[in-house]
Regions:
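Mid-domain alpha/beta scaffold segments of enzyme catalytic cores
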Residues: 1-230
Length: 230
């Protein structure tokens, strides 16, 4: 699965992929209203299986490409407006949905309750899910998946959280190029995370849950196939 980040990279990403590759379309550009139609056009490509990651973010980033970046309520409301439009596109084109939520649980759950559609059941994931039982209960109720990334190897709260999640709800992610898992995080500080590191994440979770890596990987793979309708 190859995620895109900005629309400028979408077409080239589609062009370089082979028949075994599927693509996720994100929607993170601040001035994005004019891009909605472009995204809708890309959704007609069969290689595109998901919209994401998309969502609501209240985190104050130290570094950003936007010089005027501020977390103000007007900006949060704008994020909500465009998230709703993207959810509608996922429903309309029967695509999976990869949700980004950072420090915005109340906003996210309220919005999802207002627009939820049965078509999203089994086709939606909380990407890099925060260790929050409110998110877990919503995901369980609506047959969503919980995404687990490299930070599970050093984030103690997530380690305890993941022990409570049924295996049939878990999918493994790398969040490449971010969130290098340990021990790479310390040994290779400053280097990009890569998809191949999914193995490290799977092995760590298996040790955490006291099960075999093979059985856990098979379950997570089956979950991913269901999520992305592969």
């Amino acid at each position: 699965m190859i995620p895109g980040f900005f629309l400028s990279s979408k077409t080239s990403t589609i062009n370089i992929t082979n028949n075994q590759t599927k693509i996720e379309l994100p929607f993170k550009e601040k001035k994005a209203k004019k891009e909605l139609k472009k995204i809708e056009n890309l959704l007609t490509n069969p290689k595109v299986v998901a919209i994401g990651e998309v969502g609501i973010d209240r985190h104050i980033y130290q570094k950003t490409k936007y010089p005027d970046y501020k977390i103000e309520e007007e900006f949060v409301e704008l994020q909500k407006i465009f998230l709703i439009e993207q959810i509608k596109l996922a429903i309309k084109y029967n695509k999976s949905l990869i949700l980004h939520n950072r420090e915005a649980k109340k906003d996210m759950l309220g919005l999802l309750e207002s627009v939820w559609d049965k078509k999203l059941e089994g086709r939606t994931v909380f990407h890099c899910c925060e260790p929050d039982f409110g998110l877990f209960e919503f995901a369980k109720k609506h047959k969503m998946f919980i995404g687990v990334d490299g930070d599970i190897t050093y984030y103690k709260e997530k380690q305890e959280f993941i022990k409570t999640i049924p295996l049939e709800m878990l999918v493994f992610e790398t969040d490449s190029p971010f969130l290098n898992p340990e021990p790479l995080r310390k040994k290779e500080r400053g280097t990009n995370n890569e998809p191949k590191n999914i193995k490290i994440i799977a092995e760590y979770i298996a040790s955490l849950l006291h099960c075999s890596t093979d059985s856990l990987s098979k379950q997570a793979t089956e979950n991913a196939r269901k999520l992305f309708n592969l």
